[in-house]
From Swiss-Prot:
GO biological process: isoleucyl-tRNA aminoacylation
GO molecular function, one term: zinc ion binding
Cofactors (names): Zn(2+)
Family stated for the protein in its record: Belongs to the class-I aminoacyl-tRNA synthetase family. IleS type 1 subfamily.
Function: Catalyzes the attachment of isoleucine to tRNA(Ile). As IleRS can inadvertently accommodate and process structurally similar amino acids such as valine, to avoid such errors it has two additional distinct tRNA(Ile)-dependent editing activities. One activity is designated as 'pretransfer' editing and involves the hydrolysis of activated Val-AMP. The other activity is designated 'posttransfer' editing and involves deacylation of mischarged Val-tRNA(Ile).
Motif stretch ('KMSKS' region): 593-597
Name recorded for this polypeptide: Isoleucine--tRNA ligase
Enzyme Commission number: 6.1.1.5
Species assigned in the record: Geobacillus kaustophilus (strain HTA426)
Subunit note: Monomer.
Domain notes: IleRS has two distinct active sites: one for aminoacylation and one for editing. The misactivated valine is translocated from the active site to the editing site, which sterically excludes the correctly activated isoleucine. The single editing site contains two valyl binding pockets, one specific for each substrate (Val-AMP or Val-tRNA(Ile)).
Binding, ATP: 596
Listed InterPro entries: aa-tRNA-synth_I_CS (IPR001412), aa-tRNA-synth_Ia (IPR002300), Anticodon_Ile_BEm (IPR033708), Ile-tRNA-ligase (IPR002301), Ile-tRNA-ligase_type1 (IPR023585), Ile-tRNA_ligase (IPR050081), M/V/L/I-tRNA-synth_anticd-bd (IPR013155), Rossmann-like_a/b/a_fold (IPR014729)
Residue positions of motif 'HIGH' region: 57-67
């Protein structure tokens, strides 16, 4: 007889290799065919809503690793919530207006000048939709479940219509105004920029010290002194109208070889060193406020430069006397307003000097630096020229330097709602907690928001002008424009005359002849995405404002978190979100930023081709995403190894359930042996820990708990021990059915617990569970597992956890015996233990076959105490252990070594246990 035929070896079609790159798309096709998103929404209808509102990625180019991290994190949360008592819709969105699309079209050879604005905008829209289709395909490949057929898109008419209403509501509350103000200006984009569109990079700039001769000392100065300023922007000297000092600082008049200079007392030493004044002395000291209204002369124009007082002056650097050009700086502008100074801005939108800078007109501002410095030297005003490398604002899209330039722009007042904004921040839950400090400080310190852009591709600012130039924004015009946009899209603004965009018969006191013009600027794209709480959460029936969660990268504290907060508080007085969670950036394996030049860019599509989406998702779960995270081939291989172990654990359990039907064969929980109940108690603990980790968005804890449970609790303990029962015992024996009961409960629970992170694998497991109690086609249509009721659970855990410590001792002794070649596999060993008192009591109380549990052929507990163990015993923490080779023959069927092999003459190579099983169940 071939005894192999009598063993119940695992059988399953669940493959050992994941082959995810091939299998995942097949699974996704299946989900699509069953319309899984709709099914989940129908199943969870009527439950409390959990709304994670998707921050819209920009519709341009392939997705990068930051996108993948972001979308996978969102998907894990949404999937978990929909299995945890919530209805969790997920509506993905796209941000579609702005310069990158205009630039992309220019690169494709689209000549904007050769077509009307409306035509150009149609091309932009077409391009945006192509990009959306491309990105949608890539996001779906990540396994992200959502309403992909009905996303929100910022260029859609219904979205733009709501955005106009947000603008109108803000205008109605007096929060929108037009003003001449210095704003970040990008010569390379020829447009104003918001703070969120600025990034800081190192730049080399000239560093000059310039002397302004005093013209009228007002009795405080003699009139022959020269006030020393320091600047890194010589091109702004032609726009100088004042010199600012701090009212409370001391200022020295110093003598240097007969010439007198004015500098802040605290900086005199460093200025002297910088300029190279060898011998200098203090002639007198005055307070800044005494210098107010002293008149200096511009170094090379016939023009005064007034000394003014400003709280913004510091002694961090420079001279304490600040060159002030109201057209080129926010502080300069504000102090200029206070003193009634004109706003002079001799630089055009392309960055070229104008006629208002005689001698330099037509020069690009960077080139003018040199010419102006030479001019200062000619007139004897240049005290020192050097160069510094410093952090300087750049246009985040063109990567070129920006300038401050006073222009007429539309602004949203932050000042008027600042306290409400700060209160809303306080009422929001920020994860991590430092997020609150970050956004609080930004909102506390930020200026008003410049919302106008001098471009074509965006939502028009819905303002009309009367004959006298007065801006017109009324409830009536806003309502009408909003309805027009809903019907025709915002292109209608560029296709029709102003009169055709106004309500029929509209009149206004500013236009007695009924002639109106319209604004040509568009809104900042941050106003687009920042209006999504109104245009998406309020507009759509399946969503609600405030959202439960916004989740984006940490760059969005100044971006979307901020613009959404500003518009929502302006319109509703409340934040648009209850909670905000931020993640870090994705770096390479060495912690460097990814860049094409370094050749260290890891692309999601490539990772999925090589490893599969579930591996990428498992990587997301494995990292501390609230800080910056690292990814590399090596890291992904480590994650793949963890995946392989989890998969193998599933495969082993599935293979050993091939003949198990829980409805027919399950053993009632109360009738299971202790070790089986202990395993279920461990499963209960896992369920509680994993759910808690998901609830607190701690996916790394889910990853570690699941990995530990599969490798340590299951593979290395229970499953290893259970093989002797599963393969050897009779198919329908109580012991085997008990183990199968545990395996069934465990495989079902684990498939559900891992489903939010590994949806493809979880569903593959689900399909392969034989005779499932829950007859649903996808694990996504189930709920998270509940703990199994076990009598005396805590006492059971305490007792068996203590046994695991004793087991560790015995395993150490076995390992040492193996290394010393005393034994081979553990089944060739005979073990005698000499326990300490506690351990003796424990071992005596266990309702289990310890020989089987320890996977040895013979096991005995000596009568002698621990201290009386013979010299050959290895003394460990709880027991002293003697390991010897087991005596007897090896049973051909179960591999146990015993002297009783052949006791049944009809089975000379079997132990009595196997002979009995074969006789009972397999005899011909």
């Amino acid at each position: 007889m071939d005894y192999k035929e009598t063993l119940l070896m695992p059988k399953t079609d669940f493959p050992m290799r994941g082959n995810l790159p091939k299998r995942e798309p097949e699974m996704q096709k299946k989900w699509e065919e069953m319309d899984i998103y709709r099914k989940v929404q129908e199943r969870t209808k009527g439950r409390p809503l959990f709304v994670l509102h998707d921050g819209p990625p920009y519709a341009n180019g392939d997705i990068h690793m930051g996108h993948a991290l972001n979308k996978i994190l969102k998907d894990i949360i949404v999937r978990y919530k929909s299995m945890s008592g919530y209805c969790a819709p997920y509506v993905p969105g796209w941000d579609t207006h702005g310069l990158p699309i205009e630039t992309a079209l220019a690169k494709q050879g689209v000549d904007r000048k050769s077509m009307s604005v409306a035509e150009f905008r149609k091309r932009c829209e077409q391009y945006a939709y192509e990009q959306i289709d491309n990105q949608r395909r890539q996001f779906k490949r990540l396994g992200v479940r959502g309403d992909w057929d009905n996303p929100y898109i910022t260029l859609k008419p219904e979205y733009e219509a709501q955005q106009i209403k947000v603008f109108g509501e803000m205008a109605k509350k007096g929060l929108i105004y037009k003003g001449l103000k210095p704003v970040y200006w990008s010569p390379s984009s020829e447009s104003a920029l918001a703070e969120a569109e600025i990034e800081y990079k190192d730049k080399r700039s000239p560093s000059i010290y310039v002397a302004f001769p005093v013209k009228n000392g007002k009795g405080v100065l003699e009139g022959d002194e020269r006030i020393v300023i320091w600047t890194t922007t010589p091109w702004t000297i032609p726009a100088n109208l004042a010199i600012a000092v701090h009212p409370d600082l001391d200022y020295h008049v110093v003598d240097v070889s007969g010439k007198r200079y004015v500098v802040a007392a605290a900086l005199a030493e460093s200025v002297a060193k910088e300029i190279g004044w060898d011998a200098w002395s203090v002639v007198k000291t005055v307070k800044g406020k005494e210098l107010e209204y002293v008149v200096a002369r511009h170094p090379f124009y016939e023009r005064d430069s007034l000394v003014v007082c400003g709280e913004h002056v510091t002694t961090d650097a420079g001279t304490g006397c600040v060159h002030t050009a109201p057209g080129h700086g926010e502080d300069d502008f504000l102090v200029g307003q206070k003193y009634g100074l004109p706003v002079l801005c001799p630089v055009d939108e392309r960055g070229y000097m104008t006629e208002e800078a005689p001698g330099f007109a037509g020069m690009f501002y960077e080139d003018a630096n040199k010419a102006i410095t030479q001019k200062l030297e000619e007139v004897g005003a240049l005290l020192k020229l050097g160069f510094i490398t410093h952090s300087y604002p750049h246009d985040w899209r063109t990567k070129q330097p920006t300038i401050f330039r006073a222009t007429t722009q539309w602004f949203a007042s932050i000042d008027k709602i600042r306290n409400e904004l700060l209160q809303a921040i306080k009422e929001t839950k920020w994860i991590p907690e430092w997020g609150e400090i970050r956004i609080h400080n930004m909102v506390r310190d930020r200026g008003d928001w410049c919302i106008s852009r001098q471009r074509a591709w965006g939502v028009p600012i819905p303002v009309f002008y009367g004959e006298n130039g007065e801006p017109i924004i009324t409830d009536e015009t806003i309502e009408h424009v909003s309805n027009l946009f809903r019907q025709y899209g915002s292109n209608v603004w560029f296709e029709r005359e102003a009169k055709d965009l106004l309500p029929e018969g509209f009149t206004h006191p500013s236009s007695p002849n009924g002639i109106f013009t319209k604004e040509t600027d568009i809104m900042d794209v941050w106003f687009d995405s920042g209006s999504s709480h109104q245009a998406v959460l309020v507009e759509r029936d399946d969503l609600v404002r405030p959202a439960d969660l916004y989740l984006e990268g940490s760059d969005q504290y100044r971006g979307w978190f901020n613009s959404s907060l500003s518009t929502a508080v302006a319109v509703t007085g409340k934040a648009p979100y209850k909670g905000v969670l931020s993640h870090g950036f994705v770096l390479d394996g060495e912690g460097r930023k990814m860049s094409k030049s370094l050749g260290n860019v890891v692309v999601p599509a490539k990772v999925m081709e090589q490893f599969g989406a579930d591996i990428l998702r498992l990587w997301v779960a494995s990292v501390d995403y609230q800080a910056d995270v690292r990814i590399s081939d090596h890291i992904l291989k480590q994650v793949s190894e963890v995946y392989r172990k989890i998969r193998n654990t599933f495969r082993f359990m599935l293979g050993n359930l091939f003949d198990f039907d829980p409805n027919q064969n399950a053993v009632p929980i109360g009738e299971l042996g202790e070790v089986d109940r202990y395993m279920l108690a461990k499963l209960n603990k896992l369920i509680a820990k994993v759910k808690k980790a998901y609830d607190s968005y701690d996916f790394a804890a889910v990853y570690h708990e699941m990995n530990h449970f599969c490798t340590v609790e299951l593979s290395a303990f229970y499953l290893d021990m259970a093989k002797d029962i599963l393969y050897i015992e009779a198919a329908d024996s109580r012991a085997r059915r008990a183990v199968q009961t545990v395996l069934y409960e465990t495989v079902v629970a684990l498939a559900k617990l891992i489903a939010p992170i590994l949806p493809h694998t979880a569903d593959e497991v689900w399909e392969h569970i034989p005779n499932r109690r829950e007859n649903v086609e996808s694990v996504q249509l189930t709920d998270m597992p509940e703990p199994i009721a076990i009598d005396g659970e805590e006492a059971l855990l305490a007792k068996w956890d203590a046994f695991m410590d004793v087991r560790d001792d015995i395993f150490k002794a076995l390992e040492n015996a193996r290394n010393e070649k005393v034994i081979g596999k553990s089944l060739t060993a005979s073990v005698i233990v000499y326990p300490k008192d506690e351990a003796r009591k424990l071992l005596a109380s266990l309702d289990a076959d310890l020989r089987q549990l320890l996977i040895v052929s013979a096991f005995s507990i000596a009568d002698e105490p621990y201290d009386a163990a013979p010299a050959e015993a290895e003394r460990l923490d709880h027991v002293a252990v003697i390991v010897r080779p087991a005596e007897g023959e090896t049973c051909e069927r179960c591999w146990t070594v015993t002297k009783e092999v052949g006791a049944d003459p009809s089975h000379p190579t079997l132990c009595p246990r196997c002979a009995h099983i074969v006789n009972e169940h397999y005899s011909a």
